[in-house]
From Swiss-Prot:
This is Cytokinin dehydrogenase 10. It is found in: Secreted, Extracellular space. SUPFAM superfamilies: FAD-binding/transporter-associated domain-like (SSF56176), FAD-linked oxidases, C-terminal domain (SSF55103). InterPro entries: Cytok_DH_C_sf (IPR016170), Cytokinin_DH_FAD/cytokin-bd (IPR015345), FAD-bd_PCMH (IPR016166), FAD-bd_PCMH-like_sf (IPR036318), FAD-bd_PCMH_sub1 (IPR016167), FAD-bd_PCMH_sub2 (IPR016169), FAD-linked_Oxase-like_C (IPR016164), FAD-linked_Oxidoreductases_BP (IPR050432). PROSITE patterns: FAD_PCMH (PS51387). Residues 64-245 form the FAD-binding PCMH-type domain. One of its GO terms (cellular component) is extracellular region. Glycans are attached at residue 289. It comes from Oryza sativa subsp. japonica. GO terms for molecular function: cytokinin dehydrogenase activity; FAD binding; oxidoreductase activity. The keyword Transcription regulation does not apply. The modification Pros-8alpha-FAD histidine is found at residue 103. Monomer.
Length: 550
């Protein structure tokens, strides 16, 4: 039998050579132009070797694995269009999944038996690499390739004194990846998620068409793709809004022993989005008692002395958890003289435990790239490439205290997780409901992230235990059972019915958009939303032709 790699290449080559290598180029205002791509050039970019397929069979989660038949390394977006059109030329199309840095946790970027597109190869011409990030200072935007890392977008924009407005906590992930989900962070209460800060996209659809879209042109595709989980197209370029960049940050954490003032103060802070009196960034963390008394003795923010004081607070108050609001106040040379006074005035409005306010002064880049430094520490300790059974939820404000009581004081009461638990509110009116991303039906909702790791020999429990706890949390949240009514962020559902409940009233629209832009369901199969259609039935035998068993 021919080895799998050789067989795959042979079948693809022979089938591809039978197609016409004629592609559609980007659609601008409905005008089509032609673009020829050599079939042999496309074939040379499909890698079926063990190293390539093995890397593409795992992700940051290290929980599920699925091997593709090949990895495609495109030089241009038109190469991706050619690959998709090749798939569509087959009686049974192969699936295609774009992969950035592989930071998904449940195989969302997998293509079992199909082709994974290594987006990082875009712009790589062998002898040189095109830097696919261009800043318009006059019009205050940056054009960034879908494969570009946010950390590189940051550094490029800062050369012009500009910055995007909203950041995920971790910056070494791709533009296309976060925009396919939403892209949330501590600035989202003020500016919405990253998808609310996009002016224009270049997209390769599941039909192999290269289309430029915006809220005004090809708007159905634009709104479908943003938060669309890769179901309608591959983002190859995004035009992202910029603003003047600050130079430094007052980085603050304030502690609470009770969830009620913690949530009240967070909601007060995000209500100040239209004024200049509040924080520019608001997030929050939940630290379970056992992680203080039995966890590490220092962190990238807290000193050993700080953690000892926080441990004492937990013991003295008998709290199951200590809650932190994390805030950031940006400033530059013009506001440096007044920032401390502004911060003090804001803190006076809040009801944290007096004496438990911690302030650091950091550069803007140091603050934004804080998780990058933590990554280096975890890699050095061998604690980065481990299973990450993460669970991210959006919880309605009306149910957040119930969630806290049932989860942090119930399901996880005796847990000692390795990792973080995030909890912070956002304003729903900063989201655009025309986009595919889903949020609860309340004006304010909380992002809750159980960002836990299964570290070998650690005290956080094994993967199975963490998964059981996640399942209990999801059961609590399940809408079908009359639960809290959460929505998953970076969602994973094991059934079609689960996806129907996830999208709710949007399900019909999502299904219609799928039929329009990816009718053969070849894109991003790892999400498990739309199964590919079955292969066509063979034609009946001609009259007099013997019927043979297959």
């Amino acid at each position: 039998m021919m080895p799998r790699a050789q067989l795959t290449t042979f079948l693809i080559v022979t089938s591809f050579l039978s197609t016409v290598p004629y592609l559609r180029a980007p659609v601008h205002g409905g005008v089509l132009t032609s673009y020829d791509v050599s079939s042999l050039d496309i074939m040379s970019k499909i890698h079926t070797d063990h190293d390539a397929t093995t890397k593409a069979s795992s992700d940051f989660g290290h929980i599920v694995h699925a091997t593709p038949n090949g990895v495609f390394r495109p030089t241009f977006p038109a190469d991706i269009a050619a690959l998709i059109r090749l798939s569509l030329s087959q009686p049974t199309p192969f699936t295609v999944a774009p992969r950035g840095k592989g930071h998904s946790s449940r195989g969302q970027a997998f293509a079992p038996g199909g082709i994974v597109v290594d987006m990082s190869a875009l712009g790589d011409h062998g002898h040189h690499t095109s830097h696919r990030i261009d800043v318009s200072v006059d019009r205050m935007y940056v054009d960034a390739g879908g494969e570009q890392l946010w950390i590189d977008v940051l550094h490029t924009a800062l050369k012009h004194g500009l910055t995007p407005r909203v950041w995920t906590d971790y910056l070494r992930i791709t533009v296309g990846g976060t925009l396919s989900n939403a892209g949330i962070g501590g600035q989202a209460f003020r500016h919405g998620p990253q998808i609310s800060n996009v002016h224009e996209l270049d997209v390769v659809t599941g039909m192999g068409e290269m289309i430029t879209c915006s809220p005004e042109v090809n708007s159905a595709l634009f709104f479908a793709v943003l938060g669309g989980l890769g179901q309608f197209g591959v983002i190859t370029r995004a035009r992202i809004r910029l603003e003047p960049a600050p130079k430094r940050v007052k980085w603050v954490r304030i502690a609470y022993s009770d969830v009620h003032p913690f949530t009240t103060d967070q909601e007060l802070l995000i209500s100040k989005w239209a004024s200049g009196s509040g924080f520019d960034y608001v997030e929050g963390q939940v630290q379970l008692n056992r992680t203080l008394t039995q966890g590490r003795r220092s962190s990238s923010f807290f000193s050993a002395t700080d953690l000892a004081r926080l441990t004492g607070l937990a013991i003295d108050t008998g709290s199951v958890a200590i809650y932190y609001i994390e805030g950031a106040m940006y400033y530059d040379d013009n506001t440096a003289a007044s920032v401390d006074q502004k911060l003090d005035a804001l803190l006076e409005e809040l009801s944290f435990v007096r004496g438990f306010v911690f302030v650091r002064d950091a550069s803007y880049v140091e603050f934004l790239d804080r998780v990058g430094r933590e990554e280096q520490n975890l890699r050095s300790a061998g604690a980065w490439d481990v299973p990450h059974p993460w669970l991210n939820l959006f919880v309605p404000r009306s149910r957040i205290l119930h969630f806290d009581a049932a989860v942090f004081k119930g399901i996880l009461r005796n847990a000692n997780p390795v990792g973080l638990i995030l909890m912070y509110p956002m304003n729903k009116d900063m989201w655009d409901d025309r986009m595919t991303a889903m949020t609860p039906d309340e004006d304010v909702f909380y992002a809750v992230g159980l960002l836990r790791s299964a570290v070998a020999g650690g005290s956080g429990g094994d993967v199975e235990q963490l998964e059981r706890e996640n399942a209990a949390v999801l059961e609590l949240c399940d809408l079908a059972g009359g639960g809290i009514g959460c929505r998953q962020y970076l969602p994973h559902h094991a059934s079609r019915d689960g996806w129907r409940r996830h999208f709710g009233a949007k399900w019909g629209r999502v299904a219609d958009l799928k039929a329009r832009y990816d009718p053969r369901a070849i894109l991003s199969p790892g999400q498990g939303i739309f199964p590919p259609p079955p292969p066509p039935s063979p034609p009946p035998p001609a009259a007099g032709e013997p019927i043979t068993a297959s």
